[in-house]
């Protein structure tokens, strides 16, 4: 059975390992990178089905990386995962082209659901943020 290929971008090793394990139940995590520039490069090289990216990364952040990726591939399916729930950042992430916005402290089933939604072309925002 085909498992969608997911690229993970997270600069904290412990968090990356936790997210990789969580995503690995439903998806094939093809690579994990630690910054936005590496994310853009890996996206071009690996052509994943979906991308899960932290916002706070060194150099190019997750929102800027989303803009760069979507400029090159308007169909890219990107879910941002972050500790930041401010409406300004949610709006910026979605405006950049992300289909999902999930808070790290609620990541779990919600992150998996967000990736599935993104793969189907649907938007998903953490329930805690009150936007869907």
Q: Which positions does each model-derived feature cover?
A:
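Short amphipathic alpha-helix used as the core "switch/output" element in two-component signaling
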Residues: 41, 63-75
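Active-site beta3 strand of CheY-like receiver
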Residues: 46-52
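Short, flexible helix-to-coil linker/hinge segments that flank and couple to helix-turn-helix
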Residues: 88-95, 100, 105-132
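As written
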Residues: 48, 62, 74, 94-99
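Active-site residues of response regulator receiver
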Residues: 54, 82
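Two-component/phosphorelay signaling modules centered on CheY-like receiver
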Residues: 12-31
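Conserved sequence signature across two-component system core domains
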Residues: 9-10, 33, 51
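Acidic catalytic/metal-coordinating carboxylates
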Residues: 35-38, 58-64
